[in-house]
Amino acid sequence: METDRQGSESGACDGCCSDCSDEGTQSQQPTIFTDTRASLARRDYAKLLASVGGLTAVASLTAPLAGLTRVFEREYTGPVYSDGIYLVDGDGNRIEEKALSEGEKMTVFPEPRPGIEKAPTLLVRHAEDAYSDAVKTEYMVAGYTAYSKVCTHAGCMVSNEEDGTLVCPCHFGKFDPTDGAAVVGGPPSRALPQLPITVSSEGYLIATGDFNGPVGPGGD
């Protein structure tokens, strides 16, 4: 069974994510965003409600819709990661190679630096032979792979899991982390972008570039 190592990312999803805690400060909260490299037309709430069953879903969608408001109001304006950027947890601690065991995952972020966006990222670790050919081997290290946590369907956080898949709680999109975060269920039309990573000389996980595709909705 996959275990989630939680970081301090309170409020990131306005309570709709299973791995958000109540600790931390506002300055630690990641921002949900869309990427201008992806073309996304603004949608209204009526269309969102219709997609999940109509007005009877209003009460259950209060938290997801609050998060989606921020998706629509923000666009990507700079690099998410770049070569040499350290991966850190919600408290700003750099991630060591030994941080996760096989089958575990955690939410990480790029270490703060001027011009670098706050970008929630899913870090997972599996046995290297568990990954399919869809996973770029040059993007992974020591069984670690990293993917954007922003769902490619409507921009919610992919924060849940089910039978080894990563699940978005808003519309139940499912992604397989051992198959390049390919879509295996729900409405998303493309995989979560993968982040190229390696281990620094000091033993910490770092990025070797930016995500290999647009972050968030659109980009098809």
UniProtKB/Swiss-Prot annotation:
* Source organism per UniProt: Haloferax mediterranei (strain ATCC 33500 / DSM 1411 / JCM 8866 / NBRC 14739 / NCIMB 2177 / R-4)
Q: What is the protein's given name? A: Putative respiratory nitrate reductase subunit Rieske
The disulfide bonds in this chain are 156-170
The subunit structure is: Probable multiprotein complex; a catalytic heterodimer of an alpha and beta chain is proposed to associate with additional subunits involved in membrane attachment and electron transfer.
The question of whether Calcium is a record keyword is answered with no
Q: Name one GO cellular component term.
A: plasma membrane
- BP terms from Gene Ontology: nitrate assimilation
Residues covered by the Rieske domain: 118-206
Entry keyword annotation includes Disulfide bond: yes
The taxonomic lineage of its organism, from the top, reads:
Archaea, Methanobacteriati, Methanobacteriota, Stenosarchaea group, Halobacteria
Residues annotated to bind [2Fe-2S] cluster: 151, 153, 168, 171
- InterPro entries registered for this protein in UniProt: Rieske_2Fe-2S, Rieske_2Fe-2S_sf, Rieske_Fe-S_prot
Q: How is the cofactor bound?
A: Binds 1 [2Fe-2S] cluster per subunit.
> Which cofactors, by name?
[2Fe-2S] cluster
Question: Which keywords, in A-to-Z order, does the entry hold?
Answer: 2Fe-2S, Cell membrane, Disulfide bond, Electron transport, Iron, Iron-sulfur, Membrane, Metal-binding, Nitrate assimilation, Plasmid, Transport
Give this protein's Gene Ontology molecular function annotations: 2 iron, 2 sulfur cluster binding; metal ion binding
Q: How does it sit in the membrane?
A: Peripheral membrane protein
